[in-house]
Each structure stands twice: as structure tokens, then as C-alpha cells.
């Protein structure tokens, strides 16, 4: 297995089928950040059959001299619960980036650290993922927000009708201006 640079089509095909896909790991977000002075790199871990099994958008910023740092917004598109896969991805990524003078990368993976029920009973504890990342050399910086509210809705039209009128108008205007919404 090795890390290679993916073209936009390869990255888009992989990211569209991945369960952790998000707007910050997209070509559109990369193009937006390119206007803010970042260089975009689409990197993927391929197996022996040339199948992509992990990928990331890496935003590159030059530091002084020949050195660079990278930022992977919302983490990698990989199964963080598969410790051997994340280990291989990290080792190969370090090798790949070292040859291009990267001194560090920053990422903020979208991992639910702890999930509580509505009555604040711990339902799921994923601290083992954080511990595994620490073993691989990642430094954990505590998240500043305490809770993220997730609204589970089966009917998108009902949810939309419950929005304030001004929010519905803003959504309508955005769609008319070409903003696309992905689920």
C-alpha cells in the first residue's frame, strides 16, 4: 500500500461513496481555499489492486524557507475505527509528505468522542480512537464546543417548513445563485 496523489475525478469518486463525506473534504471546498492562498493536494491510499481505500484533501501552506504545513479539514476520509488501516495510512502519509518538506499536518476529524442520550446517559464512548491516534504521534487538542445537537429528521420537507421564513428565503436565494446542497 502507498500514498499517491489523486486527480480531482478520482478523489470525487471516492469521497462521494465514503460514509464520512463532508463539504470540507470536497473539490469545491479545495477551490475555495485555493483563493485564500492554500495549494490543494488530493491524496489517497491505494492497495495492491490500485483501489483507493483512504483519501484526504490536504491544504498546503508554505512556511519560511522550503518548509510547508498541511491541513486536512474534517480529517481523513477513512474508517477511524480500523486501527490497522489508520496506522498504515499515517505511516505512508508521513513518508510521502516528508519528501515534500512538510513539517506537520493538522486535522480535526469528525469523530463522535462521546454520544449521550437526551437524558445525558452515555450511549457510546469512542475514546479508544483518540488513544489510537495519540499512539501514532498525533497530538490531541480538546474541542472547544461542548455539545453538538444532531436533529434526526426523516421528512426533509417537514423540516424545511419549520424553518423561519427568512432562513427559507436565504436558502432559496442561495440555490438561485448556484449553491448546491449535498446530503
Please report, for each region that a protein language model flagged, where it lies by residue.
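Aromatic- and acidic-residue-enriched segments that line the glycan-binding/catalytic groove
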Residues: 119-128
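Conserved donor-binding loop and adjoining core beta-sheet/short helix segment
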Residues: 32-114, 118
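Charged, low-complexity surface patches
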Residues: 85-86, 122, 163
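Short glycine-/small-residue-rich flexible loop motifs, especially phosphate/cofactor-binding loops
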Residues: 12, 30, 94, 130, ...
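Hydrophobic, Leu/Ile/Phe/Ala-enriched alpha-helical segments that form helix-helix packing faces
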Residues: 15-18, 93-97, 133
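Acyltransferase donor/substrate-recognition loop-hinge adjacent to the catalytic core
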Residues: 1-9, 129-183
Amino acid at each position: 500500500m502507498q500514498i499517491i496523489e489523486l486527480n480531482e475525478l478520482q478523489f470525487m469518486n471516492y469521497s462521494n461513496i465514503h460514509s464520512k463525506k463532508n463539504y470540507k473534504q470536497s473539490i469545491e471546498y479545495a477551490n475555495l481555499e485555493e483563493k485564500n492562498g492554500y495549494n490543494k493536494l488530493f491524496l489517497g491510499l491505494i492497495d495492491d489492486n490500485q483501489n483507493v481505500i483512504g483519501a484526504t484533501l490536504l491544504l498546503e501552506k508554505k512556511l519560511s524557507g522550503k518548509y510547508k504545513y498541511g491541513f486536512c479539514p474534517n480529517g481523513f476520509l477513512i474508517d477511524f475505527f480500523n486501527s490497522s488501516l489508520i496506522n498504515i495510512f499515517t505511516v505512508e502519509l508521513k513518508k510521502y509528505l516528508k519528501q515534500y518538506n512538510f513539517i506537520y499536518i493538522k486535522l480535526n476529524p469528525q469523530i463522535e468522542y462521546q454520544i449521550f442520550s437526551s437524558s445525558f446517559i452515555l450511549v457510546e464512548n469512542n475514546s479508544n480512537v483518540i488513544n489510537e491516534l495519540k499512539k501514532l504521534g498525533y497530538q490531541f487538542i480538546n474541542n472547544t464546543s461542548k455539545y453538538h445537537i444532531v436533529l434526526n429528521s426523516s421528512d426533509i420537507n417537514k423540516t424545511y417548513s419549520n424553518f423561519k421564513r427568512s432562513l427559507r428565503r436565504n436558502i432559496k436565494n442561495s440555490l438561485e445563485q448556484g449553491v448546491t446542497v449535498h446530503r
